[in-house]
Amino acid sequence: MYTPIPANTPAPTAPTSSMTSNSSSASNANTTSSSGINPRNRASGTPSNERARPASGISSFLNTFGIRQNSQTASSSAAPDQRLFGTTPSNSHMSVAMESIDTAPQQQEPRLHHPIQMPLSAQFHVHRNYQLPISISLTAPTTTDHQQSSAHNFEGNNVGNVQESLNQRQPNGTNNTTTSIISMAPAATTRNIVGGADGSTIVNNSQEMYKNLRHLIYAANQPNGTEILHLDLPATSAEESNNMFNVDEVTLKQRKDKHGLFSIRLTPFIDSSSTTNQGLFFEPIIRKAGPGSQLVIGRYTERVRDAISKIPEQYHPVVFKSKVVSRTHGCFKVDSQGNWYIKDVKSSSGTFLNHQRLSPASSLSKDTPLRDGDILQLGMDFRGGTEEIYRCVRMRIELNRSWKLKANSFNKEALQRLQNLQKLTTGVEEEDCSICLCKIKPCQAIFISPCAHSWHFRCVRRLVMLSYPQFVCPNCRSSCDLEASFESSDEEDESDVESEGDQLVDQLSVLMETSKDVDSHP
């Protein structure tokens, strides 16, 4: 390594001890190997070589600790110093030679200049607008060949390797995802799926039809949403079929959300009249999908967890932590008119719609239409349902945003009366929940304490249950008894009479005072 020395600095003296000479000789060898200087230039005995000895000693000292200086940085920084301090042309020529020699091995062994390539699903996951369509196989074996799957128009996604592809849009804006789908299943079970519906066309292998049921979520502009499903509807009357498929534009628009997707909401069904257990409890599930989509219903496993962790929750399959639910129990389907269907895919414990089984064990069922408010049950209790993992799943179905309550004049007036009550009691009009700091709006579950403070019930529920029946207001710290008995009707009548009597006394006192004032003035 070459380090320039200013002109006003005295040149270093020759070494006077054997220790110094030994260290300098060792440092020369290290300098030759580290900086890449030609040994022939070192043997020329120029003064620049002698000036480089102190710097080479520093480099040898650093090499003893495993620290290697960057020769390219030192050489690039040495050139300006040479121009500043007026070094000789020979020294400047040496610095150029050092740079050229140092850059040569770097070109032979280039460093990694590009970041680590993430899977395609991980790249899209960081964006808020997730790209559709999505295809996931919950039972296919794991593959690691990302490049092979990305060559297709619509990649086959496996557990642990979820690959999504962008919608190939033509210049006119249409979606070009209705081409053939090549599944990533093993070669022994190769399938040709036309139109994007899994299991629609299978050549000479009907038993493998739904063995690898795929979870398909299409975008809102998916054409031919009803045709690609290949629905196998039960025998119904002509009037029912016309009402199902002939939907006006106003109704169709109401079924879609702001992104043009249809939705389904599943909530636990609790039957208070039942003497047995109430089934598996789960949080409300909301899924959104475009026309022609197919949502898999199955069991939650580690493979499923790895697959769904890479996509947003609203596009997840419907999975439950219950062993009475098969790995691929069934599927939901939605057509272009927003009609939803349920299909049992050879489940062992069965699927029950409004307490009626769709198909026998290990057999396919028809695509049964769903209606808002239907009760769906997956499986039957095993071992009496004593353990939660062996309980069936009962749920209520709500379709296409029907659970969204619309605020009417009555709801708005009730909220306004509540706000006026708070203003009269506390003197301050509170519009926000003091726990979540969100506004209290109509059609929301609200808890009102005796001190006239209010919160969202889901926000204050833990405080209510913590010391029930006693409740301490988190706003004013007043305590009350939530189990206090109501006043009887007789006591209410007496209180009303007393209040009316007090009002009459007040009015009489006011009249007497006014009469005295009139008499005092002539």
UniProtKB/Swiss-Prot annotation:
Superkingdom, taxonomy of origin: Eukaryota
FHA domain ranges (all copies): 295-358
E.C. designation(s): 2.3.2.27
Catalytic activity: S-ubiquitinyl-[E2 ubiquitin-conjugating enzyme]-L-cysteine + [acceptor protein]-L-lysine = [E2 ubiquitin-conjugating enzyme]-L-cysteine + N(6)-ubiquitinyl-[acceptor protein]-L-lysine
UniProt-listed InterPro entries: Dma1/Dma2_RING-H2 (IPR042823), FHA_dom (IPR000253), SMAD_FHA_dom_sf (IPR008984), Znf_RING (IPR001841), Znf_RING/FYVE/PHD (IPR013083)
Pfam families in alphabetical order: FHA, zf-RING_11
Chain segments carrying region Disordered: 1-56, 69-92
Major localization class: cytoplasm
UniProt keyword terms in alphabetical order: Cell cycle, Cell division, Cytoplasm, Isopeptide bond, Metal-binding, Mitosis, Phosphoprotein, Transferase, Ubl conjugation, Ubl conjugation pathway, Zinc, Zinc-finger
Cross-link (Glycyl lysine isopeptide (Lys-Gly) (interchain with G-Cter in ubiquitin)): K211, K256, K258, K288, K310, K333, K343, K346, K366, K406, K412, K423
Listed Low complexity bias regions: 14-35
Post-translational modification as stated in the protein's UniProt record: UBC4-dependent autoubiquitination occurs at Lys-211, Lys-258, Lys-288, Lys-310, Lys-333, Lys-343, Lys-346, Lys-366, Lys-406, Lys-412 and Lys-423. UBC13/MMS2-dependent autoubiquitination occurs at Lys-258, Lys-310, Lys-346 and Lys-366. Lys-211, Lys-256, Lys-288, Lys-310, Lys-343, Lys-258, Lys-366 and Lys-412 are also ubiquitinated in trans by DMA1 E3 ligase in association with UBC4.
Protein's GO biological process: cell division; protein ubiquitination; ubiquitin-dependent protein catabolic process
EC class name: transferase
Protein name per Swiss-Prot or TrEMBL: E3 ubiquitin-protein ligase DMA2
Organism: Saccharomyces cerevisiae (strain YJM789)
Source species taxonomy: Eukaryota, Fungi, Dikarya, Ascomycota, Saccharomycotina
